[in-house]
């Protein structure tokens, strides 16, 4: 058992939640060769993942010709095994048609019959985080093949020091940031997959932080989110706020996130990407069972993340406007001071 296909072909945040599982595979058996099946959107990140050796681009949705291309590409690699961290009809058919002898996936829905090894997880109960569910699959794989289980630790992504320093200089020059201040990155967009605070709430949060900490706040924005970032900047109306809405792709964006001293967002891809660097993070979540903080906590150290959500209950669980920013600021202020350790630079 050496050549393994690992599948996490959904969104950015979901993909990042699989990195500890990739790390566990490599740490437990460095001889394993991991090939990741990912969509084109996250392929560039997969290529810089230190635990992934090769990348295969997933087929286009509902494109039968491209699906056949993908099946042939996988067959040609002659994998010894596969782990699908995310199972749907597409992945199930792919597993079956690829002819890989060892096929492991969560035991969910009818598609589980297309895998010959399954792990009952009941993820819908959200008793663990997505990253922990992914690692449980890896533990099952390792134990089945008599390989020792080595638990991974963050950070899961480290850039060369010079690369981060160069990116800091670039951001200083282009965004007008101070080299002597801490940098708080705030992502107010939702990416289409998660509810988030209102712009008014984010403005109150940022104003509260700037009143206590003399830092720079960088407003990040993904495709189609620039207008909201500018609106938020106008609401805050502080010269220490800058907008970062242009980059050269996910890898370039990741280099900028590596420069942050703190990252604040809803439960979105950028939150999970930033946590791979083990920088402090603050998240705002819905309180439904499938979206709550426990299920989608990021992959940095436990003590480097705090989360807020609205009260439980059908009428309130999805309404993040019920989160009190004044109450959150008290906890956030203490968290920041603990993370930054000293008041000399704030």
From Swiss-Prot:
CDD domains: GT9_LPS_heptosyltransferase (cd03789)
InterPro entries hit by this protein: Glyco_trans_9, LPS_LOS_Heptosyltrfase
Designated name of the protein: Putative glycosyltransferase HI_0523
Class in the EC hierarchy, top level: transferase
Cited Pfam families: Glyco_transf_9
EC number: 2.-.-.-
A GO biological-process term: lipopolysaccharide core region biosynthetic process
Keyword Transferase: yes
GO cellular component, one term: cytosol
MF terms in GO: ADP-heptose-lipopolysaccharide heptosyltransferase activity
Family designation: Belongs to the glycosyltransferase 9 family.
Keyword vocabulary terms for this entry: Glycosyltransferase, Transferase
């Amino acid at each position: 058992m050496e050549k393994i296909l690992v599948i996490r072909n959904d969104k950015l945040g979901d993909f990042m939640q699989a990195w500890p599982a990739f790390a566990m595979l490599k740490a437990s058996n460095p001889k394993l060769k991991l090939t990741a099946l990912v969509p084109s959107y996250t392929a560039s990140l997969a290529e810089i993942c230190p635990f992934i050796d090769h990348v295969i681009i997933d087929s286009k949705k509902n494109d039968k010709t491209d699906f056949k291309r993908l099946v042939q590409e996988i067959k040609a690699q002659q994998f010894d095994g596969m782990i699908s961290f995310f199972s749907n009809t597409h992945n199930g058919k792919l597993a079956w048609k690829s002819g890989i002898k060892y096929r492991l996936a969560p035991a969910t829905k009818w598609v589980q019959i297309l895998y010959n090894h399954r792990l009952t997880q009941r993820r819908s109960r959200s008793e663990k985080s997505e990253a922990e569910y992914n690692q449980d699959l890896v533990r099952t794989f390792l134990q089945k093949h008599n390989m020792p289980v080595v638990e991974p630790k963050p950070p899961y992504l480290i850039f060369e020091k010079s690369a981060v320093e160069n990116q800091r200089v670039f951001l200083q020059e282009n965004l007008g940031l101070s080299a002597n201040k801490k940098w708080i990155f705030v992502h107010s967009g939702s990416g289409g997959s998660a509810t988030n605070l209102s712009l008014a709430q984010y403005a109150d949060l940022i104003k509260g932080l700037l009143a206590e900490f003399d830092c720079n706040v960088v407003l990040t924005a993904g495709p189609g989110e620039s207008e909201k970032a500018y609106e938020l900047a106008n609401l805050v109306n502080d010269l220490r706020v800058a907008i970062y809405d242009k980059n050269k792709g996910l890898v370039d964006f990741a280099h900028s996130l590596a420069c942050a001293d703190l990252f604040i967002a809803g439960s979105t891809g950028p939150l999970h990407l930033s946590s791979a660097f083990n920088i402090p993070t603050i998240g705002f979540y819905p309180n439904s069972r499938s979206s709550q903080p426990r299920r989608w906590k990021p992959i940095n150290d436990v003590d480097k993340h705090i989360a807020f959500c609205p009260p439980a209950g059908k009428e309130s669980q999805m309404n993040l406007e019920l989160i009190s920013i004044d109450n959150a600021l008290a906890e956030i202020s203490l968290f920041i001071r603990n993370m930054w350790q000293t008041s000399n630079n704030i």
